[in-house]
């Protein structure tokens, strides 16, 4: 993948090869694939996430000295085209030797070099897919279900949202978002099961049965809709980038975010802490979007709080700034 290629451009190109990209949650329409994965933006399918670097593997980087370096499997003295002619595939990120130079470039705070291309892990294009919604009044049972699902390596897409986040993703106007926030349950776990290869129907059937059993043990249920919102609508939404305005900006016009990595068992505690911070300001916690994304096979997770505000309101801007600064200090 070269710089500037977006997810909207990558998806149809991969589909012709029987593949699909590992998607972050609703990336902006103009977001570069390479930029997203250099920033370690989490993907929504933790089963394909084996280490924090994934799905980025090899890169070619030009350093400030003019030196060109290729990392991982590509670290041999020949061009990319010459490697393809030899049957080489750029599938391993570590290298040369045992040093992971790709990881040095990820999350860099400043310019270390210019990346001219990168190789990424993809997933087989599903022949069948089915998405389920699991709702609850509090996130704790849903976190326990996410643990159980990732432990058994079931499903593909798996993420936890509160109603403020899901409404912002589904709605296109402030009025529609507000109406959805009233209708939707407080917390929703999104579970997608895909099937590629042979016997796709059977694969979906046995995974659905196992996930249903896990949910019932926690007093939960897998459903095809939540508050009249069909799972197919959410599945279509998750399959690509944000069509127009970034979903975090739709309701108020501007937004600020706090995000960090932790483990799933601590996620609910951080949510409670941020709820207490929000109670000290005018903005109620219900107006704050929460997104919990299991990563690295469920070994840890990405937790994100999204605070919307009107850029025309000095008071709202100050409140959002205060909540980000105070929240970052208390959650650190």
Residue ranges of each PLM-predicted region?
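Generic recognition of long tandem-repeat/solenoid scaffolds
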Residues: 1-2, 258
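FAD-binding subdomain of flavoenzyme oxidoreductases
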Residues: 3, 7-145
